C-alpha cells in the first residue's frame, strides 16, 4: 500500500476514535427530514464536503453503495429513502471507522422508530478493489474521499465504481476542486492530502477522469466555496489557494459518438417569432422557454450564430431535465 494511503488510514483511524468536527468542513446544511434524527456523534463524524443524497436518484427501490462510511450519516440518510434490509451497502477500509459506524447506527435505531440497522450492510474493503460483483448497484456514492487519491488511484477508484454499477446507474460524488496551482510540496504532504486539502484538481480535469472510464453523462449539481490555503498557515505556499467543493452525478450511459454530455447548468432560450426552433439534431426549443443543455449542445447552438437564441453561462447547479 502506498505511503499516502497508509497515512490516510491513520488519520481516519484517529478520527473514528476521537471525532473531530473540524476535520472536514461541510459546506451544506444537514438535511432536516420528517422523523429523521441524527445521533450527535454521527453528526460530529460527518467528514464530507457536500451531500450525495438526492431523492431524484433514489426512485424504484435502488441498491445503494456508499464508499468511505465515516460516522454513517449518509448511510442513514440513504436508508431513510429505502427502508429495506440490505438495501444500502457501506464499504470502508478502516476497522475503527466500521466499529464506530456500527455503534452510531445502533444509536440511530433508538432515535428513529422507522430505522433498523439491518437496512445497512457494512463491508470491509477498499475503493480501489470493491467487494462487489459487476453491475449489481443502482446508485453509488462517495463524499470527500476520491480527492485524496493520486491520479492513477483515482482512475482505478472510478473504474471500480463504473464496474459495479448497472447500466444507467448513477455515481454521486462530492469532492474539493481548485483552479489554482497547488505546489508539489503541498500536494505531496500525506497528511494534508488525507485531510482533503492538497488533492484538489481543476474541475475540468476531474470531469475528464470521470468520462475517461466510460461515463457518458455527467451532471454538475453544485459548486460552493470550501477553503483558503494561505501562506500564513502553509509555509510551502507563496499565494492563497482557493478551493471549492462540487457535487457531481456521473451516469453510466453509453458514450455518445461525439463525446460525453456534461451538464454544468447552461440553458438555451429561443426568443424568435416562431413557436419553436428545431436544430434538427434532436433539440426542440420552445419559444421563450429555457431548455437545460449540456455544454456540447450549448456550443453547437452557439456556433449557429442565430440572432434569436441565447445561451446562458454555466451556473454549476444543474437540477435535471434538458436536451439529452
Task: Give the role of each language-model region.
Residues 25-63, 74-81:
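Conserved alpha-helix/loop element of class I SAM-dependent methyltransferases that forms part
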Residues 60-129:
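Class I SAM-dependent methyltransferase SAM/SAH-binding core
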Residues 128-140:
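A short acidic, Gly/Pro-enriched loop at the edge of an enzyme's catalytic core
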Residues 138-152:
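A short SAM/SAH-binding and catalytic strip from SAM-dependent methyltransferases
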Residues 155-170:
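A short glycine-rich, Lys/Arg-flanked "PGG" loop and its adjoining helix->strand segment in the class I
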Residues 176-197:
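Short, glycine-/aromatic-enriched active-site segment of Class I SAM-dependent methyltransferases
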Residues 198-214, 220:
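Short alpha-helix
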Residues 213, 219-225, 229-324:
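C-terminal lobe and adjacent flexible extensions of AdoMet/dcAdoMet transferase-like proteins
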